[in-house]
């Protein structure tokens, strides 16, 4: 459901931006906030859980469970590793749009390129899960971790190709970005489902839900670092073109723009 929502939401970004300009992106945020609020109301008033065991924990119990998770070296190591994975995933929104628009031109469609990720996940997750069903969760996640650097290298390679030669009608930067996103989506199908499975298996009986909640500590960490680092990297390697007196000066300043993806390849 998450990936279906991710796909459908990004589909309307490009036409909205073309119709309303950057003002359309602000309107889209209002729309998203409104729909999220309606979903919250729907859950509050209409969702009734048939399973109530384990509910009603005190803040003290929750705090003690958090301490247990943070003192488990295996779980903390896994959270840090998965944080690196999601830092790279977040670049679909933190780095990729500006990177593509600045290097491939305003005619590029970064919102549609980002849609490749949920599309790949929806199409392949059942196949990958079936293929890896007899393998351990750690084995499946390890395969995904090996795929992620390939994704970053594909994204970097676009800037090293001749920008005057299109590939399937697309600028090389845009085309290789899509290829990288395909690998990124494939890596996610190996990692995300089995990560939750592994985390739940480490939980004491009856506290699986609580531990699954703490498994999302990686979301907190990856959002902070994943959206903080790109600002520095874009300023250094792929700066805003309007800051330069001429296009030639900007070309010189952004010649190594693909270095950005080397950083994320190392993180992955």
Located regions from the model:
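Helix-to-loop junctions at the C-terminal end of transmembrane segments
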Residues: 17, 123-143
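Hydrophobic core of transmembrane alpha-helices in multi-pass small-molecule transporters
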Residues: 1, 165-191
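Loop-to-transmembrane helix entry
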Residues: 27, 101-122, 143, 171, ...
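Intracellular juxtamembrane helix-capping segments at the cytosolic ends
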Residues: 1, 100, 189-204
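Glycine-rich segments within core transmembrane alpha-helices of 12-TM secondary carriers
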Residues: 1-17, 33-36, 114-118, 214-230
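Intracellular loop-helix junctions on the cytosolic face of multi-pass helical membrane proteins
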Residues: 7, 13-93, 97-107, 260, ...
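Loop-to-transmembrane helix entry/capping segments in MFS-fold secondary transporters
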Residues: 1, 107-108, 174-175, 200-218, ...
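C-terminal ends and interior cores of transmembrane alpha-helices
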Residues: 146-169
């Amino acid at each position: 459901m998450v990936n279906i929502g991710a796909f459908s939401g990004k589909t309307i970004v490009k036409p909205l931006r073309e119709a309303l300009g950057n003002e359309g992106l602000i309107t889209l945020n209002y729309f998203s906030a409104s729909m999220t609020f309606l979903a919250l109301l729907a859950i509050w008033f209409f969702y009734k859980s048939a399973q109530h065991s384990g509910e009603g924990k005190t803040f003290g119990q929750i705090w003690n469970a958090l301490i247990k998770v943070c003192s488990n070296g295996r779980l903390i190591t896994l959270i840090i590793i998965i944080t690196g994975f999601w830092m790279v995933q977040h670049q679909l929104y933190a780095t990729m749009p500006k990177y593509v628009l600045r290097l491939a031109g305003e005619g590029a469609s970064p919102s549609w390129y980002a849609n490749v990720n949920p599309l790949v996940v929806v199409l392949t997750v059942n196949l990958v899960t079936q293929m890896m069903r007899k393998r351990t969760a750690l084995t499946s996640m390890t395969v995904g971790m090996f795929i992620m650097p390939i994704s970053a290298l594909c994204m970097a390679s676009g800037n090293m190709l001749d920008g005057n030669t299109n590939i399937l009608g697309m600028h090389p930067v845009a085309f290789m970005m899509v290829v990288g996103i395909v690998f990124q989506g494939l890596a996610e199908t190996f990692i995300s489902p089995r990560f939750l499975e592994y985390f739940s298996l480490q939980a004491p009986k009856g506290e699986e839900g609580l531990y699954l909640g703490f498994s999302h500590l990686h979301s907190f960490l990856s959002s902070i670092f994943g959206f903080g680092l790109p600002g520095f990297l874009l300023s250094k390697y792929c700066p805003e073109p309007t800051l330069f007196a001429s296009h030639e000066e900007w070309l010189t300043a952004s010649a190594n723009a693909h270095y950005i993806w080397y950083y994320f390849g190392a993180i992955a």
